[in-house]
Each structure stands twice: as structure tokens, then as C-alpha cells.
């Protein structure tokens, strides 16, 4: 497993370098980044994060450290800048475990920020049983990494957006949203410094928080004949749902969309405002959205494995999130 893990990581880093070296001299549009999102790469990302070497990615474990290193190495390979005091942002979980968020900045031309996040932790290995967490939430991290790479590719081609994109892989979600609250504390206390501008990122500088949490499953369908669906939870007034509707007109996307959690006001409120990583941002008035394909019967089970995900549909969801961001930046 070690050899396969290292080979797959090497291949992903090599593909990132190759993408950065593409020829110029053509009209730049967001569509130029579509080829970065491939089913093969997404599958490799999920397989790496669900490998036995990552051991289920429970906070404070060697498997979590390996997952952090994997994410950090890819952030670095994409050219995402690290804060002066480091890419790994340490904190303690509710159970006292050492945990770390992993961050990377893609500089924009202006002074505002958009946070794009996905939690990488899961429940680990219990009583000798590995809980891989493919959908929850290796799929979200794979989406995060792919979106980061897509925007980096556009920047290499000469396209820069006004807000700086702050990509964050969050730890400790399964323990009281620890990583999300730690990220907010660092922002509120001025401890997260923009490595390019050289000044702290403050809450008032943030335009939006986008959270990606479980986007690989197809079992919790909106309509039984449409496995290709996506749920976006947001406040109606600030979520920019129109941006997702426009993104969905692309033939490469064309998903079955919903803006609530299966028609339930109560479940929509719980998942949007209480139990997901956008909570501390919402609590402080930052417009936030959550992308998900919903909870399935595999959640928190050993059967949540990489082969159970639909990577063609995951790719389309990644494109939807990417084009949503393009519209709101």
C-alpha cells in the first residue's frame, strides 16, 4: 500500500506541473480550466485519502498527519502561498487531540477574500476496522483540491480575480466543528496573515464562505431517476443561487439542483446553520453556502469506500462549484 500511495501522489503532482506549463496565446475564459477536472484525478485523490496509510484520518493520529501532508504538498504544487508562520494551523479538539487545518492563498488583485473549505477528518480506525470516509469527506477534499488547481491554472494563463481565494482543509469537524471554529478564531484575532499582502486577514475582509461537504454520493437522490444531483444550502438573499443556476446551464454540468434539504425546513436549518463548517461564519454574518449530495446509508460506516463513488458525477459537481465561484468572485 505504501508504494501505491507514493506512486499515486507522485502522479498527481506531476500532472499538476504539466497543467501549469500549458501554452499561451489564446483567449482566456473559465472554460480553459475544465480539463483540469478529470474523473481520473478525482478518483486518485479519494483513493489517497481513503488509503490505509491515512487510517480514516481521525484527528491526532498518524493517519491524519499523512492526510495533512498530502493536502499541503498539493497546495504547494499548485503554488498556493503559505502564511509566514506556516501552512499548518494547530489547535486542540474537544477531546484534547492535536489537530491542524491546512491553508493556502491564491492572491487576487483586490483586498477582499473568499474562503473555500472542506473538512478532511473522519472517525479513523475503531476496534481494528478502518472507516475510510470516501464520501465523508474525501470527496469534498478532492473537490477542494481540484477547484484550487483550476483557479491556479487560470492565474497561470493570466486570469486573476479580484478576491484572494483562501483554501482551507479543515480538521476536527467530527468533533464539534473544531477546525472551522479555530479558523474563525484566527481570523477574529488577526493571527492568519496574508503571505502576499503581509497583513492579517480580518473577518470584515471576507465576502463569502463556501463549504464543500460530501459531494460524491448518488444514493440520496432528489428524484429517483436522477443520480446526478447537487444541493446548495444558503440564505436566499445572500447565497447567489442565481450563480449556480447559470453554472448549471453548461452542458458539462446540467445537474438536478435543490436549494433545501429534501424539502424539510427543519433539516435545512440544522444542516445549514448548526452542524456544518460554515456555522461560525454564519453566526457572524458572513454570507455562506454549503454544497452537498446529502447523507447516505454509508455515512460513518466501513462501506464508505472509494469504489462506491460516481466520479463522472463528482466531476460535474466540481464544475458546478467552480463555475459558481467564477460568477460570485
What are these regions (language model features)?
Residues 111, 170-276, 288:
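Metal-dependent peptidase/peptidase-like ectodomains
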Residues 49, 75, 92-127:
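Acidic/His- and Gly-rich active-site-bordering loop/insert found
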Residues 28-36, 52-62, 90-93, 101, ...:
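Second-shell loop/turn segments in exported
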Residues 23-66, 78, 82, 293, ...:
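N-terminal capping segment at the start of a domain
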Residues 292-329:
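His/Asp/Glu-rich mid-to-C-terminal helical/loop segments that flank catalytic regions of hydrolases
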